[in-house]
Amino acid sequence: MSSWLDKFVPSIVRSESKRSAGSVPEGLWKKCPKCENVLYRPELEKNLDVCPKCSHHLRVSARRRLDIFLDKEGRHEIAAHLEPEDKLKFKDSKRYKDRLADAQKATGEKDALVAMQGALNGMPVVAVAFEFSFLGGSMGAIVGERFIQAVNVCLEKRIPLVCFSASGGARMQEALISLMQMAKTSAGLERLKQEGIPYISVMTDPVFGGVSASLAMLGDLNVAEPNALIGFAGPRVIEQTVREKLPEGFQRSEFLLEKGALDMIIKRDEMRNRLYNILSLLTNKVA
């Protein structure tokens, strides 16, 4: 049955309108979670996924993070073959095995950490980045092992390590195995320290739980992106526990910098050059 509009609008116009509407690619626009402006995705990507309206740093994938940070040439992924196992046969409302399969399909990653050897403005480095979209960037056995293998490359080649954290903490589905990764990664970083090899921890939004209580806060330099949420327990959990309203901006990177918990805050478009200059000083390779 035709509508009253069909009588007034020629069929050729209606068909052209439908064709035009269907030709707009999906995912061409993205809404800023802070200012709520609708942003053109290609322009947003050119701006390193930072909102041009309010300068909010949007969350990015692990590979996007490493692509922004490392030089384009000479990259080599570390421990890419490692895959997680459901050794405990864990099941809550869903089997852990199924959660892993869903996360792998959604992200294209085998687990929540990507490690790469590459260069920063020509300086050899190893960089690792958490994939928050993979089970909240939670740390399990494979995340811990990839981190340690990245540390081993740094020890072998005597090059710096940079870690971009974005995690909800330890992976509950791996229970004690997950908690062991806190000690494992911390022990690996102690080996770097003993050898005098620099480790810079970059905290991005968000960093919580066992990751914030271990590798994220153990850098020779602890830095963060603007407005990143960083802590151990989340603000809602704390408010429910202490039954008090938290201060404005509590657990944001600016608040932590003011209280001395961070060394500096670096904008995304300044990250490469700022960290290159710092690592040049720490490795005595100032041009």
Swiss-Prot record:
PANTHER family: ACETYL-COENZYME A CARBOXYLASE CARBOXYL TRANSFERASE SUBUNIT BETA, CHLOROPLASTIC
ATP-binding recorded as keyword: yes
PROSITE patterns assigned: COA_CT_NTER (PS50980)
Annotated EC: 2.1.3.15
Family per similarity comment: Belongs to the AccD/PCCB family.
UniProt KW keywords: ATP-binding, Cytoplasm, Fatty acid biosynthesis, Fatty acid metabolism, Lipid biosynthesis, Lipid metabolism, Metal-binding, Nucleotide-binding, Transferase, Zinc, Zinc-finger
Catalysed conversion reaction: N(6)-carboxybiotinyl-L-lysyl-[protein] + acetyl-CoA = N(6)-biotinyl-L-lysyl-[protein] + malonyl-CoA
Subcellular location: Cytoplasm
Pfam families attached to this UniProt entry: Carboxyl_trans (PF01039), Zn_ribbon_ACC (PF17848)
SUPFAM superfamilies membership: ClpP/crotonase
Cofactor(s) the protein requires to work: Zn(2+)
Source species of the chain: Marinomonas sp. (strain MWYL1)
Entry's cofactor comment: Binds 1 zinc ion per subunit.
Binding site for Zn(2+): C32, C35, C51, C54
Span of zinc fingers (C4-type): 32-54
InterPro entries, per the entry: AcCoA_carboxyl_beta (IPR034733), Acetyl_CoA_COase_Trfase_b_su (IPR000438), ClpP/crotonase-like_dom_sf (IPR029045), COA_CT_N (IPR011762), Znf-ACC (IPR041010)
Recorded GO CC terms: acetate CoA-transferase complex
Subunit: Acetyl-CoA carboxylase is a heterohexamer composed of biotin carboxyl carrier protein (AccB), biotin carboxylase (AccC) and two subunits each of ACCase subunit alpha (AccA) and ACCase subunit beta (AccD).
Protein name, entry field: Acetyl-coenzyme A carboxylase carboxyl transferase subunit beta
GO MF, one example: carboxyl- or carbamoyltransferase activity
Domain CoA carboxyltransferase N-terminal: 28-287
One of the protein's GO biological processes: fatty acid biosynthetic process
